[in-house]
Amino acid sequence: MSKLITTEPLKSMAEVISNYAMKQQSVSERNIPKKQSLLRKEITYETEVQTSADSIWNVYSSPDIPRLLRDVLLPGVFEKLDVIAGNGGVGTVLDIAFPLGAVPRRYKEKFVKINHEKRLKEVVMIEGGYLDMGCTFYMDRIHIFEKTPNSCVIESSIIYEVKEEYAGKMAKLITTEPLESMAEVISGYVLKKRLQVFGFEIKPKLRFNLLLCLIICLVIAGGMFVAGVPL
């Protein structure tokens, strides 16, 4: 009987079951979508400005920056730049559109960070734009560094994540040029408005008091001159 009873039937069964399981696993693996590889990129532009860090930051962080960009600093650049949520602070959402032919043509962005202590502002694209062209994340970051009391550096950065197959295409499209233009017009705007006395920049809040003091001094000096009092 020992010669007649063998494990061959069990071996055959195990082999059949094993092959079946391997086939099922193969089918299952084919049905699982492959995880797309993402690349994280960062590009930065820096420019030095001969004015105080606070004066530049006051414009970048201003709740009125959307209107200022649309109507004063970059007139005609935007087809639309509307605040659709918020009041200019963190959480504000902008709906932006450019004239026909611009890339990207339209998108929405959100102010996610405004840190006055660090002079740091971050704005994230939340709809449209590069998000429809292969990017899964896109953010503008503005950081103002004080160099001297009367000079600063504007650091403008773009951080984005893109699907690997679109990386080459997006690298050609995404540049710091828009942020460079913004830094240029904001710097020019501030430099035109600044007031210096003996090489020191006078903050806007002090200008009225300074002007008042100068007027008083002139009035006193004029009165002394009329009265014949030696100056």
Swiss-Prot record:
GO terms for cellular component: cytoplasm; membrane; nucleus. The keyword Iron does not apply. (4-hydroxyphenyl)acetaldehyde binds at residue 140. Keywords: Alkaloid metabolism, Hydrolase, Membrane, Signal, Transmembrane, Transmembrane helix. Its main location: membrane. Pathway: Alkaloid biosynthesis; (S)-reticuline biosynthesis. It is a single-pass membrane protein. One of its GO terms (molecular function) is signaling receptor activity. The keyword Cytoplasm does not apply. Optimum temperature is 50 degrees Celsius. Optimum pH is between 6.5 and 7.0. The active site is at 121 (proton donor). Its EC number is 3.5.99.14. Coiled coil: none annotated. The chain crosses the membrane at residues 210-230. Detected in roots, stems, leaves, flower buds and germinating seeds. Activity doubles within 5 hours of elicitor treatment and continues to increase for at least 80 hours. It catalyses: (4-hydroxyphenyl)acetaldehyde + dopamine = (S)-norcoclaurine + H2O. Belongs to the BetVI family. Involved in the biosynthesis of (S)-coclaurine, the common precursor of all benzylisoquinoline alkaloids such as morphine, sanguinarine, codeine or papaverine. Condenses dopamine and 4-hydroxyphenylacetaldehyde. This is S-norcoclaurine synthase 1.
